[in-house]
Design a protein with these regions (language model features):
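FIC/Doc superfamily catalytic core
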Residues: 1-99, 103-260
Length: 260
């Protein structure tokens, strides 16, 4: 299943280029849906090289992972969050593909949560360092051998489990708040509630949402403010990531959203 998922998520064949420690550039071809054929590793922020499972180990470890998951689902002793947490950690320690492992890990987490009626989970960029720190703390407790990581227990990965549970709780609170908000003045971006200082900001966003090709003059007329003020607000919203202007046609794309 994970290989089929990988095949669906990445291009069938593509080349990856990397710079080696001596400065030379090497390349290799990624085969979608195929397990890795060369070792993979990562340099941690502490400067250490962290090795994942070898290509030789990978098929057997992935078979064990899938067998364990199916048995754990049938047994029903672990909650959906615990299942997703442990699967994610074990999968990451194997890193079975040469590229796209993060995407597959996130998709598998959401697949497990969805099977149990829970909403999809997003690991937002602002939590990335906390995520990496929690993984590192779990790695120290588990041991750095790939086979140890692939057989880790929930108790061993407690730091990562605590982080993951808090993340799920935070996202659920966001979803509930988003679904129950009734004010048109409240917007949302990247899992956070936004209340604008000026009522004209929400008017501008709504107008852009309705017509991505709207002009500065038209926005000024709708919001009842000067064109210069519109330009200033658009600049601020662009810097914060709420909107982005496409280079191809000049239209505006909105990343913030309203509940109503």
């Amino acid at each position: 299943f994970t290989r089929l998922l990988h095949q669906s998520c990445v291009r069938k064949y593509y080349t990856v280029y990397q710079t080696l420690p001596d400065g030379t550039i090497s390349s290799y071809i990624i085969h979608a849906g195929s397990y890795k054929t060369r070792p993979n590793s990562v340099i941690t922020r502490y400067g250490d090289r962290f090795e994942y499972a070898s290509p030789q180990e990978t098929p057997a470890l992935m078979t064990d992972l899938v067998d364990w998951y199916n048995e754990a689902e049938t047994a029903g002793k672990l909650s959906a969050v615990e299942l997703a947490t442990l699967f994610h950690y074990r999968y990451i320690r194997i890193h079975p593909f040469e590229d796209g492992n993060g995407r597959i890990a996130r998709l598998m987490v959401n697949y497990i949560l969805a099977r149990h009626g829970l909403p999809m989970l997003v690991v937002r960029h602002r939590y990335k360092q906390q995520y990496l720190d929690a993984l590192h703390q779990a790695d120290v407790r588990v041991g750095f051998s790939p086979s140890e990581g692939a057989q880790a227990t929930l108790a061993q990965i407690a730091p990562f489990s605590v982080f993951f549970k808090k993340l799920v709780a935070t996202e659920l609170q966001y979803i509930i708040a988003f679904a129950t908000e009734t004010s048109a003045k409240v917007w949302w971006y990247d899992g956070q509630r936004i209340v604008f200082r000026s009522p004209s900001t929400a008017i501008l966003l709504t107008a852009i949402e309705e017509n991505p090709m709207i002009t500065i003059e038209q926005l000024a007329q709708k919001a009842g403010i000067a064109p210069a003020a519109v330009k200033k607000q658009l600049q601020q919203m662009t810097l914060k990531g709420y909107i982005q202007r496409k280079e191809t046609d000049g239209s505006l794309r909105i990343f913030a959203t309203t509940s109503v």
